């Protein structure tokens, strides 16, 4: 994903998107956290962590590599083993360089027969370049993507494992988007489109070609870097613009789930991420759970570096995000 500098989007405040600093407007709209039942189903962070390791054991999942193909097979079989119906949406997608990435969006559906549905999604590919690494000699090294890729998929698999206990009132589609992290590195910026469309290729494709004709969902929740040791999640600007009510509900659910230390009820930055085409093209109000860390490393210290490895994953962050999702799902009627 590509971070959008707040200063470039000052006009967004006039559109109700807020600013990159803490404001009271959104937090004052948060609901009553004391009148909703708290689910007793518990997210297992150790299980989710094991799923991160399993993906990383294949190596960086860069499109058009054997590691990518092998991990795709693994994710498909894991969801199938949990009793979900799985669709592999194949597409040949063009990168900013004009290369063709053989891509697969993986859609795993719980109770596909139900009309009322929600989406939980993440990207599963790895960035080909560690272009934010402190060591410039490593900038052309692929990223392992334990946090920026594998963590979201791992949380989804663990949530899917618990659905028979949770007994949700709605169907759930877990979507693993491919080819998200191939935006131009700094040495190729001259080739990059100005609208950020070199990122999030898989979600752009799905948003224009959903896996089911006429597909709709109540809302979507995007998981992006949900295992960082330094993670803090603020209201993301694009989410507030298109899915404000869902955003506030989700952050309220986090307070009930005991994850208020992670989900700060204040406004953060903006991200060019998979939720943008989901909101703007598919028309599904979608929230982005993405870190907003004040300082030099907005998305966390391991973002797009060779240090994005399993040993730098926090089980507490996985637990907080996963438990928040279980709470949010349990509140659907």
Name each model feature, range by range:
Residues 57-113:
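A non-catalytic alpha/beta surface segment that caps or lines the substrate-entry region
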Residues 90, 100, 219, 226-333:
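Active-site-adjacent substrate-binding region
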Residues 15-19:
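C-terminal motif of bacterial Sec signal peptides marking the signal peptidase cleavage site
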Residues 34-42, 57-66, 93-96, 138-150, ...:
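Second-shell loop/turn segments in exported
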Residues 140-245:
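Acidic/histidine-rich catalytic neighborhood of metal-dependent amide-processing enzymes
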Residues 61-63, 92-95, 112-114, 124-128, ...:
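Solvent-exposed loop/turn segments at secondary-structure junctions
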Residues 21-23:
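Bacterial signal peptide processing site
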Residues 25-71, 82, 297-312:
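N-terminal capping segment at the start of a domain
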